[in-house]
Regions:
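Switch- and interface-adjacent substructures of P-loop NTPase systems
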Residues: 8-11, 37-250, 258-329, 339-344, ...
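TerminUS-proximal long segments
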Residues: 255, 326, 335-336, 348
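PEST-like, low-complexity acidic/proline-rich intrinsically disordered segments
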Residues: 1-9
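Glycine-rich phosphate-binding P-loop
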Residues: 16-38
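Conserved beta-strand scaffold positions in the cores of enzyme catalytic domains, especially
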Residues: 17, 331-335
Length: 366
């Protein structure tokens, strides 16, 4: 039996949170938000360290857009911009030797080009980081010699997660739940297929799972498999997590993430129906964005309502009841934008009590 760590037990053990989800679902952004909200944010040295990564994101963005123009049959809006296109392509995927004035001038020229913008609008047809538009719109700021990344810049900086990351922080416990301070350990593991074999290393003793879904990815494919839809992969992965016998005792909270990008994509004409035909029969209320987000939520709710297909270990079977044989298990859903600190603060406050209640209920206290 696991204790959740309250004073009444004579010790204060950490509540362990595990972030799960496919690649680029926003898990690492949540880790950064916890640092902002609970560990005094980023130091000067950490901000300086991010400058290079952010400029690498700029190059990755413009290079990926430009190199996909020919395969998509898109020409430059102006032929006079061809030298800038050639310059970026010659830099290759690794970027230029130096991020100097010449480099940023070429990026600026291309980002203003109508053909480049058209290719950007079709970015669901190739791989492009979510923060491409954000950083390319800020070229004038990012090229300055005295540029210092803001929290917003760092939150949007994309670096692939490899292995296991851990962050520790403390949170005040509501007076209604005995008060005091609670330690939290949050684990982030890489979400791409090649990283998932490492997940089992952190399953032991997990109190709650935050499963992140990139809702705006409904029309995109995986980086590691161009034949698989990202949202369909998330649904499959979520079902595996939901049915895993190693995680039966962990509370489960689903973050339907990237709502800002989802809304923007829908408002620009993107439709989930082309990839999920069952959406055409969806009768939910509201405008197209609300209907789309609620439809995605319902697909994940449907997973939780399926009968568990994997047998429980004999030693645990007597502890779980659902209908005739399966455990009743709640799953909570939140619409989130992981890059929005105020949104994450609100959601964490709401989920904090859920997590504590779940931990207490596991030991029969609440």
């Amino acid at each position: 039996m696991r204790l959740c760590g309250f004073i009444c037990f004579g010790t204060r053990m950490a509540i362990k949170l595990l972030l799960l989800g496919t690649g680029e679902s926003g898990k690492t952004t949540i880790i950064k938000q916890m640092k902002i909200l609970h560990i005094q944010g980023f130091s000067q040295s950490e901000r300086i360290e991010k400058i290079g990564h952010i400029r690498n994101n700029v190059h990755e963005s413009i290079h990926d857009i430009v190199r996909n123009m020919a395969p998509l049959g898109i020409a430059l809006g102006s032929a006079k911009n061809a030298p800038s296109q050639d310059y970026i392509l010659r830099c290759g995927a690794g970027g230029p030797p130096h991020y100097d004035e010449e480099y940023f001038d070429h990026v600026r020229v291309l980002w203003r080009d109508a053909g480049v913008r058209e290719c950007f609008k079709r970015s669901n047809e190739y791989q492009l980081i979510d923060s491409a538009e954000y950083f390319l719109d800020r070229i004038d700021l990012l090229e300055k010699p005295d540029y210092m990344p803001s929290d917003a810049d760092i939150l949007r900086c994309r670096q692939k997660t490899s292995g296991i990351q851990k962050i520790e922080f403390k949170v005040k416990v509501p007076k209604s739940m005995h008060g005091g301070i609670q330690d939290f350990w949050m684990f982030d593991v890489g979400g791409q297929r090649g990283e998932r074999k490492k997940w089992i290393q952190v399953f032991e003793g997990i109190h709650a799972i935050w499963f992140l879904v990139a809702c705006s990815d409904f029309d995109q494919t995986l980086r590691e498999d161009s034949t698989t839809n990202r949202l369909k992969e998330a649904l499959t992965l979520f079902e595996d997590v939901w049915q895993s016998r190693f995680l039966l005792e962990a509370g489960l909270i689903v973050f339907l993430n990237k709502q800002d990008l989802l809304q923007r994509k829908v408002e620009r004409g993107g439709s989930i129906a082309a990839h999920f035909p069952q959406y055409r029969a969806w009768t939910g209320p509201g405008g197209e964005y609300q209907r789309t987000r609620d439809f995605i939520r319902q697909m994940f709710v449907d997973v939780t309502q399926k009968q568990r297909q994997r047998a429980l270990p004999p030693s645990s079977a007597e502890r779980f009841v659902v209908g005739a044989a399966w455990r009743a298990r709640e799953c909570y859903f939140h619409y989130t934008t992981a890059t929005d600190t105020d949104n994450v603060r609100t959601v964490f406050r709401d989920t904090h009590q859920i997590i504590l209640t779940h931990a207490l209920s596991n030991i029969g206290v609440y």
